[in-house]
């Protein structure tokens, strides 16, 4: 019973960290990565919210630019429109689109670092809520006399250790992203 609660908490905490990592990949650092275009949607064949990566291949042209190559060449105008809507400035090169990523200003990098910290804090709150849920489940087992007082204490200690380890992981992910942001 306690192992199930602990495993469930670990799985949910790991998902919170994965969600944080995914969110942080979409924050522009000045380095061009295809993940920056994950949230770009285009109007493809009547569907207004088709993800860009389903209608084009996205690759790195160099460290500061991406190359978007549509699978269907007639989609270039719609892809350009989707990129403009997502606040990118595409340059059409015949059958492909190049997107230059200028490095952010010092002020913008500091804003982005604050955003990274905010996202990290959100992940920590999610992890603490998972801890709270697990502790409630343990308390319910204790109340129902399904476990002893010692098992309850041990279970709560294990959940706390799990929480501390996952919060440390969040701190590392946030610190790595901030370092990447603030280095020019």
Swiss-Prot record:
Q: Where would you find this protein in the cell?
A: Cytoplasm
Cellular compartments per GO CC: cytosol
At the top level, the lineage of the source is Bacteria
Its main subcellular localisation, reduced to a broad class, is: cytoplasm
SUPFAM superfamilies on file: Ribosome recycling factor, RRF (SSF55194)
Keyword field: Cytoplasm, Protein biosynthesis
Q: Which GO terms describe its biological process?
A: cytoplasmic translational termination
Q: Which GO terms describe its molecular function?
A: ribosomal large subunit binding
Q: Please name one Pfam family that this protein belongs to.
A: RRF
Family membership, please give it. Answer: Belongs to the RRF family.
> What does it do?
Responsible for the release of ribosomes from messenger RNA at the termination of protein biosynthesis. May increase the efficiency of translation by recycling ribosomes from one round of translation to another.
Protein name per its UniProtKB record? Ribosome-recycling factor
Give the organism, scientific name.
Answer: Stenotrophomonas maltophilia (strain R551-3)
Q: What is the lineage of its organism?
A: Bacteria, Pseudomonadati, Pseudomonadota, Gammaproteobacteria, Lysobacterales
